[in-house]
């Protein structure tokens, strides 16, 4: 028998099958989905490969498969092949997403094991020897007395409780009294979580209506997609919990996806308090490779029926899915920005169609495309218009910063926001200040000649970080010393422009010195568990003001927060992206939703230089429907998704001549192949950020509704490019990417 394998390498020219003989002794082990080791080319080391087909004979002279490692299912291999075509990547890259973490030879993880101690002789026999005085050592006697009551203890435990040494234990082993047995232990990311159990809540009429409609499809094993559209605080999570309970009753598995930034202790604790941690597995990037390895095993063995995770948890190794829930479905993190550039929402839909179960997409600010599908009845809309605990939506006020400047206020806090913070402090209530930009100042400029400090590797301004007293590039991580004189004109008129979270923290501490503050952004949560520690401090340690980027918006419930201030609502408007209005509306609505979530009324103050922008105005009114009507009309007029697909083909490299010639080849190839009546194919041009990490960046854009032939044309083009032996240029395609930059 012959196995058709894909070599586990990212090179585009290896995105094809190679034939290998299946030796007689491996015939029962090799199936479609097997990971195998094979000799490849002239290399002396074996390569990992994936079996994607089996046939009787080959027309080539073939080598033998050397070893079988582990298996994926035929269903997973079919999904990987579909993904490779859809997302313009190698099959092997897709298979990796579904493979067990920690099984690569370079980074192989093994089961974690410890030695535990058991009595080798019968207890009665040991009792006789202790009483007869045969065992004279007091420490040996203490160790045996302890083990009579505590068999399975570790060496450290025996030593700690009996004050004996390893040498004493070795003597007992040598004399046949005890034995050391190796025991596997799980690396459990939830091991320190002790949560009080909670009971399910009584659903409101709106919640019950939504629950019943989704539960009907669970009971009937039927595929259907639902948009659970509910205002912030409307109780979507309680519906998720009660749906998962119904899936558990059927003995099936639930997958709950949340944005990585929302995978907070608070989110996970709600599930543990309802279902316990034994039945729960968590998958996200902050886990160690060993923890991911053990959580994956727990799922594979059927010991976890509830899986909570970020985007990649959609590939959890389970065949008995009863529901997939995608919370905050509008979040951009559900689309991968590195190869394979897949959409977790699209994968969920494919899995559900083939597995006959429902998908629930939850959001207070749905993705425009999702809401459009609901309006066209392609998915079922379920609406929650009221907050679950009868708390009112917060009052939202817009402050025009142009007017503040005209009145002489140059502070980062408008008069209204300053007064509300002071009032909150007197009332012993908490405040959140939001700015979607970290650092101290966003750029440094010489006022004499206009020089701007830019990264030496990227064509982008450096950001000043006050606490480290350094300039940092947020694209490549490059750091340099702070400038005191201009390198161009030698002037000392260096000024810091823009505002980041560090600067807000410093300014607030100056303006309101009696307030206690804490900051949460990428710089302060880089260590494991630091995210949790900051939130716990804010919640429990009488901290008055939390300052942060969008990570403070997601997955948190602070009962004592009654004021939210948005420092600069324009940040997300000033980007080169057709979704700028949508993202601005979403983030402002989500931020506003943090205020007044209990009985206390909430206030939100949005500071902006563009008070008349419709996305800011309608975020103040929290009117998604009107926002959608305006935005969808603009998209229809300008032909943007959902009225077409956008494909960006990116070129990056160090040799400008080769890069431009490669981009021209791709343009001419696709221009000649694709139907110009159906597709707008734009010529390659430098990207808006035309250099990152010392690599030149170009892009070309294709707009149109993708068909099977269009996917085929682009995939063939990419294969042809890599067969041309380009040395200094990388080319890739992305459909409906997160960023147009």
Predicted stretch roles:
Residues 8, 23, 652-654, 703-705:
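Solvent-exposed residues in well-ordered beta-strands and their adjoining turns
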């Amino acid at each position: 028998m012959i196995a058709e394998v894909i070599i586990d390498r990212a090179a585009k020219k290896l995105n094809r099958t190679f034939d290998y003989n299946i030796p007689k002794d491996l015939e029962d082990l090799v199936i479609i989905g097997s990971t195998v080791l094979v000799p490849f080319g002239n290399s002396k080391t074996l390569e990992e490969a994936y079996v994607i087909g089996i046939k009787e004979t080959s027309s080539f002279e073939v080598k033998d498969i050397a070893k079988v490692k582990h298996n994926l299912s035929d269903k997973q291999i079919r999904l990987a092949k579909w993904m490779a075509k859809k997302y313009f990547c190698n099959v092997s890259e897709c298979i990796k997403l579904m493979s067990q973490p920690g099984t690569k030879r370079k980074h192989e993880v093994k089961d974690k094991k410890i030695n535990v101690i058991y009595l080798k002789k019968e207890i009665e026999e040991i009792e006789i020897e202790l009483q007869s005085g045969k065992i004279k050592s007091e420490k040996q006697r203490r160790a045996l007395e302890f083990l009579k009551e505590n068999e399975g203890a570790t060496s450290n435990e025996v030593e700690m409780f009996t004050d004996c040494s390893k040498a004493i234990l070795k003597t007992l082993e040598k004399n046949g009294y005890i034995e050391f047995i190796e025991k596997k232990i799980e690396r459990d990311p939830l091991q320190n979580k002790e949560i009080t159990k909670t009971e399910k809540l009584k659903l409101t009429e709106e919640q019950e209506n939504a629950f019943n409609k989704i539960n009907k499809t669970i009971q009937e094993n039927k595929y259907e997609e639902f948009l659970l559209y509910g205002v912030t605080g409307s109780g979507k999570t309680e519906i998720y919990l009660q749906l998962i309970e119904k899936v558990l009753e059927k003995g099936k598995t639930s997958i709950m996806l949340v944005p990585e930034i929302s995978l907070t202790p608070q989110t996970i604790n709600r599930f543990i308090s309802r279902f316990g941690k034994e039945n729960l597995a968590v998958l996200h990037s902050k886990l160690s490779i060993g923890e991911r390895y053990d959580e994956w095993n727990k799922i594979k063995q059927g010991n976890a029926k509830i899986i909570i995770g970020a985007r990649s948890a959609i590939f959890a190794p389970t065949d008995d899915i009863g529901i997939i829930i995608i919370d905050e479905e509008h979040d951009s993190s559900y689309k991968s920005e590195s190869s394979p550039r897949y959409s977790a929402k699209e994968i969920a839909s494919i899995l559900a169609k083939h597995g006959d179960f429902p998908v629930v997409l939850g959001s207070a600010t749905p993705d425009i495309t999702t809401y459009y599908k609901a309006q066209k009845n392609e998915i079922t809309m379920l609406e929650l218009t009221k907050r679950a605990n009868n708390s009112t939506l917060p009052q939202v006020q817009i402050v025009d910063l142009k007017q503040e400047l005209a009145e002489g206020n140059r502070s980062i806090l408008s008069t209204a926001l300053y007064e509300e913070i002071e009032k909150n402090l007197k009332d012993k209530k908490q405040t959140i200040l939001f700015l979607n930009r970290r650092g101290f100042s966003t750029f440094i400029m010489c006022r004499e000649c206009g020089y701007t400090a830019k990264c030496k590797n990227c064509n982008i301004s450096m950001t000043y970080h006050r606490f480290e007293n350094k300039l940092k590039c947020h694209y490549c991580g490059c750091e340099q010393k702070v400038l005191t004189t201009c390198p161009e004109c030698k002037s000392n008129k260096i000024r810091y422009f823009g505002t980041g979270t560090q600067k807000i923290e410093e300014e607030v501490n100056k303006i309101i010195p009696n307030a206690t503050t804490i900051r949460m952004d990428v710089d302060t949560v880089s260590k494991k568990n630091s995210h949790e520690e900051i939130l716990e401090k804010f919640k429990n340690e009488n901290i008055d003001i939390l300052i942060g980027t969008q990570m403070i918006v997601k997955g948190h419930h602070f009962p004592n927060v009654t004021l939210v201030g948005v420092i600069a609502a324009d940040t997300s408007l000033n980007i080169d992206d057709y979704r700028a209005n949508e993202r601005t509306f979403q983030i402002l609505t989500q931020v506003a939703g943090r205020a007044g979530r209990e009985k206390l009324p909430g206030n939100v103050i949005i500071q902006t230089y563009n008070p008349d922008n419709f996305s800011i105005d309608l975020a103040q009114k929290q009117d998604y429907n009107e926002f959608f009507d305006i935005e969808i009309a603009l998209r229809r007029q300008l032909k943007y998704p959902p009225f077409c697909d956008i494909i960006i083909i990116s070129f990056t490299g160090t040799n400008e001549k080769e890069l431009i010639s490669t981009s021209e080849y791709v343009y001419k190839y696709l221009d000649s192949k694709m139907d110009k009546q159906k597709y707008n194919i734009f010529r390659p041009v430098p990207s808006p950020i035309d250099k990152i990490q010392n690599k030149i960046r170009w892009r070309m854009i294709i707009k149109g509704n993708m068909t099977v032939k269009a996917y085929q044309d682009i995939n063939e083009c990419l294969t042809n490019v890599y067969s041309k032996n380009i040395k200094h240029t990388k080319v890739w395609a992305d459909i409906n990417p997160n960023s147009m930059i």
